[in-house]
Regions:
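Extended, Lys/Arg-enriched charged tracts that mediate electrostatic binding to polyanionic substrates
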Residues: 13-28
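Active-site helix/loop of acyl-thioester processing domains in fatty-acid/polyketide metabolism
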Residues: 8-9, 153
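Short, small-residue-biased leader/transition segments that mark boundaries at the very start
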Residues: 2-4
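Active-site loop segments of alpha/beta catalytic cores
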Residues: 9-13, 37
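Helix-start/capping segments and mature chain N-termini
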Residues: 26, 33-239
């Protein structure tokens, strides 16, 4: 990947713009078969694109809605980054946007009582007892952003990192909440619509202090403004 970055160095955004060079590996079946079967041949691509800051203005909370749809099936492909998982979220996401919500909150497909993921990102909540809580499920896509935040919550903010069940009827245990992923790093959640009820966390207009601190810490590391834990940063010579 270092060679690839050097070959595309002209697309690296200038420091200070908040923009980044986004790299996405893709594996596509291209073999000559039309049946439902693994492809006999694959094409590996690294998609490279400069992207601007996810937020057009300041970091700000938005509202989400609990979906009646299932994102992934039990014992299915929920933990893999495959196109089918995203296809299942297109209609629910469209309907959420039509109702002026940023995205959907998906529950576990077996009991529909536990939060699993937020659209294309992971969910987290922060309790009044200073716990940083994320759902734990075999249907959740592993996220380097989530694991980075779990580490920083502990080592930088002194929060207690917890991976476990997050019941949708117990949202009042959280004083702050958000979604986390590669693109936005953190998307603060102002409130969640669940059926007829609407739960507000810290605020619908202001970012919670611990969410802000986590965002500043991780983005500061990414842009070389704060000290990174050992092994997190790799220098890529561009000359």
């Amino acid at each position: 990947s270092d060679v690839y970055k050097r070959q595309n160095q002209e697309f690296v955004p200038p420091y200070g713009t908040g923009a980044t060079l986004y790299l996405r590996p893709l594996l596509i079946g291209v073999g000559e078969n039309i049946g439902v079967a693994p492809a006999p041949e694959y094409l590996f691509i690294i998609f490279c694109m400069p992207v601007g800051s996810y937020f057009k203005g300041e970091l700000a909370p938005t509202n989400f809605i609990v979906s009646d749809y299932d994102r992934a099936a039990p014992n299915g492909t929920g933990a893999a980054k495959v196109g089918g998982n995203y296809a299942a979220s297109l209609l629910p996401g469209y309907e959420a946007h039509e109702r002026n919500f940023s995205d959907c909150i998906y529950l576990d497909p077996e009991t529909h009582t536990k939060i699993e993921e937020v659209g294309s990102a992971n969910f987290f909540g922060i309790t009044a007892e200073n716990e940083f809580v994320t759902p734990k499920s075999p249907s959740i896509l592993p996220s380097i952003t989530k694991y980075s935040l779990l580490y920083l919550a502990d080592h930088a903010l002194g929060l207690t990192p917890v991976e476990g069940d997050v019941y949708v009827d117990q949202l009042d245990r959280f004083v702050e909440a958000g979604a986390c992923g590669t693109a936005a790093v953190i998307s603060p959640i102002g409130g969640i619509q669940n059926g007829e009820s609407f739960h507000v966390f810290y605020s619908e207009t202001e970012v919670g202090p611990k969410t802000r601190a986590l965002y500043d810490e991780l983005t500061g590391i990414q842009f070389g403004e704060r000290k990174a834990p050992a092994g997190w940063i790799f220098d890529v010579p561009l000359d």
